[in-house]
Amino acid sequence: MHRIEQTQYGYKLVFEGFLQKQDLSTLLDDMKQTIRSRGRKFPVLLDMRHSRAFPADAQEIFKEAIRFFKQVGMERNAVVLNSAIATLQARRLGKETGIDATSRYIDASTEQEWEKVALAWLERAVDPDVH
């Protein structure tokens, strides 16, 4: 399951469960209908705390979704995870799509104030890897 929310700062995507290729295809379609260029850059919060790593065939669609976000103006993003495997996969996908410099990965299992940390990065560019 997934959810896309427009927020004051940009967009929030929430993933839950084990997402298959079809789930991500639906997500991509939803993104293309929901997310529009705002005429300026915007940040994205990706909440994957209740999700698991993507199967290989779904990863290509996820990369396409990342490229779409870049195309319509994504500036920074924060990815919140609970799984070491999902974190490794997210970092790899970030590198493969060229967003690794503007992505921050937050481990919600060790960071109780994960949302506060994520929003500090998204709204004010306070780097959680430095502070």
Feature-to-residue mapping (PLM):
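Amphipathic, Lys/Arg-enriched alpha-helical "gate/interface" segment within cytosolic domains
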Residues: 1-131
